[in-house]
């Protein structure tokens, strides 16, 4: 991949800089990193040169023609990336022919030709869909690809992934060959029936993301520095919210790889905020509900009489005075209200659990080498609220885990 070769050359440049300064350990570190990213004969020779000089303590000899060509090539690549191949007085071209051809290949398709856009067959798996999206998104991101219509191609790839990664939207598309959003009401009603009739039930919040937010959810931890990004469900008709600004400059994303790891506190801060928000919102929700409908999910001095719903045996509490005033019809309606509210709470908590598990898996996979032990633990994380949702008769799906 071109981006891997460029990163390898950047590491070679840093290694040569440290070698000239006599810092052999740092030079060796970046030279070895270059080989891991993109192995070359020149890189291997350079590592041997550094090790030899480290043992002898001799200064850096005059660069060989091969090394000079390597440095010139790196400088030229930097120049092409920043200024483009252009002569004086002409408009600067900031893209390569390969980038331009890729853009033209994508935009030649119609907006709803999702399989063709991602270069996939209709029998493709979820893993193949994710791999294709990640590859194309990196090549077409507007901060990386400046070819004409690259932004349009990037949006088409994002849209194709959003449809094909959602089993319900994909099934609708396979049946009709049309954009599922062109018949939003029909798709919504069909989805509600598949989910047990629960309004606004969806375990795929990425369907509501913008192309940039979708890209950040895949690559944010690897390409960005600064505050983290996290998501939470917001009740019926789930929406996705993003917190913490991220710079758009693509070069800064790559430089972030060399930054020291954040402290555990800053890594866990987004999760702490999500949990705190969920606790406060659920507390206020339950409190207001108990006032309006005269029941509570928690027993207290006012609500002392234990009750359970008829359908799912969900426990709640009432006061004896209020209970005596209710007719059998009122009690039946109250039971329906309790079950609906309880299901909403569990549904939102399930989405949060799925997002947390997905974040843990992505963090364990890393950028170059996965942490196998951490990845195993992340995959084994239980989702108790999702299990409860299944017990209530609702179908749930994994929130796009990266297995």
Curated annotation (Swiss-Prot):
* Compositionally skewed regions (Polar residues) per UniProt: 55-88
Residue spans crossing the bilayer: 263-283
**Biological process according to GO:** cellular response to misfolded protein; chaperone cofactor-dependent protein refolding; protein folding in endoplasmic reticulum
Q: Give the sites modified to Phosphoserine.
A: 58
Q: Which Gene3D superfamilies does UniProt cross-reference here? A: DnaJ domain
Domain J, chain residue ranges per copy: 113-177
Sequence segments annotated as region (Disordered):
55-95
The membrane topology of this protein is: Single-pass membrane protein
* Molecular function via GO: Hsp70 protein binding
- Coiled coil ranges (UniProt) are none
Looking up PROSITE patterns in the UniProt record yields: DNAJ_1, DNAJ_2
List the Pfam families hit by this protein, alphabetically. DnaJ, DUF1977
What is the protein's name according to its record? Uncharacterized J domain-containing protein C17A3.05c
